[in-house]
Amino acid sequence: MAAADTIAPTLPPAFSAYVPSPSSSKPQNGKIKPIVNNSDAVEQSGNVQFDPSVHLNFTAPSKVHTMKELGYKDNVGVSPVGVSEPFPLFSVEAIKQMRKEVLSENVWRHYKFSSNIAQCQLRGFAPEFAPFVYDAWKNPETLAIVSKIAGIDLVPVMDWEIGHINISVQSEEQKNKALADAARKAEEGEDEEQMPIVDWHTDSYPFVCVLMLSDCTNMIGGETALRKGDRSILKVRGPQMGCAVVLQGRYIEHVALRALGSTERITMVTSFRPRSATLPDDTVLTTVRAISDLPELYFQFSEYRLEILEERIRKKLKEIRDQKRARRPFNTQSLKRFLLEQEQFLAHMNKEMVDEDKVTVGFTDDSHLLSEDLKERSRKRARPTIE
């Protein structure tokens, strides 16, 4: 494999004073033990309203890498943009409030999921238990920032995918042991088979914005590795607390690598799709079916897809009526092409809504991967025991 390129991190102002410390708590499912101390956030008022003038801390990324620069063909994706460098997005006050909401007992109790791709994820909680998080990602100013970087007008794909959390936590003792093991293996020239936070995958949705909720001052590693069109690897160094990365992750294989030197790595991922109903919606549910409340996921997926179809039909109906009033001949072939596209749209939608009794909770197959070697690697991994 070719040597990996790297993107240097962008350091945000005013975050050095907020450093979370670990504490112990009861395990939620016998595997994951939340040890994150969130006391700084808990001291805040319970009803903090998102205010973009206070809580946005945006500075444009120094560079945005195009799909072409990453080695992909012009027809891949819904935008020319591949991935941005890390950039400051939210203030320290915003991050504290987000941590307060997402690390609450109710979220851990009702919205924690795990799979063979990622050990600990929190999903679907924003409308009920995280109003600040919900409003932050629905705010027009936030959407304008993400859309400008992505090179296309975007909206959150659906409420269920607002504020998805990936978590890796360990005790101080575990942190020190991992550092010592990594140093020993490096000295002996061994290749360390690191367990990633989120294994190789493509996203189910066109774009994601990945926000760092942890202090990364002493963190080693923790990058997101992207597979380029020529199969080489580009490592995007993890953003600092309050910083984010915009990625067209539906079309690029990527992995969240393990971080050393820190007791936690918590990222928030919000997924986006094009606002325009006339643009393709390549959403799949491959990587999210097994880690979701399926009836809710299917309802929200159906709702927005049928809204897209409704808008397309209304637009086409207006077009043929206008042509009739203008005494233009009816274009049969144009309508047949439109109908075929909508048939394919509905067939794809039907395919993604797999019957609930055929979905294995916590297990995602390799159909989301693009590269044969990664598919083969995935097949060789032992299928986890579902508890």
For the regions a language model picked out, list residue spans one by one:
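A short beta-loop-beta micro-motif enriched in histidine and acidic residues
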Residues: 160, 194-207, 232, 239-240
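Signature of the catalytic double-stranded beta-helix
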Residues: 83-166
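Short acidic N-proximal helix/loop "leader" segments that mark the beginning
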Residues: 39-76, 101-115, 122
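Intrinsically disordered terminal extensions flanking catalytic oxygenase cores
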Residues: 1-59, 282-387
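Catalytic micro-motifs at enzyme active sites that drive phosphoryl/nucleotidyl and oxygen chemistry
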Residues: 151-153, 195-200, 257
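Catalytic core of Fe(II)/2-oxoglutarate
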Residues: 219-321
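Active-site-proximal segments of catalytic enzyme domains
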Residues: 161-195, 219-225
